[in-house]
Amino acid sequence: MHTIRLKDNYIKLGQALKAAGVVESGVDAKFAVQDGLVKVNGQTETQRGKKLVSGDKVEYDGETIVIE
């Protein structure tokens, strides 16, 4: 499990995937999200720019990212 502590009020989904190290680049994040491979709070998310806030949970490729 990866934890991301927010410095601002939110982080975008693509940025969170990169920050946690579960994708190598923004392009990888873009395709993972567009292909419906990423879940936010248990729901498939297809918007790479979705704003994540404290308490959100992201799942991708067997990895979990918790936003704090």
Indicate where each model-derived feature is located.
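A basic, amphipathic helix-loop patch mediating RNA/tRNA/ribosome contacts
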Residues: 9-54
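A positively charged, amphipathic N-terminal helix/segment that binds anionic biomolecules
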Residues: 2-3, 57-68
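A detector for short, charged/polar N-terminal pre-domain segments
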Residues: 1-11
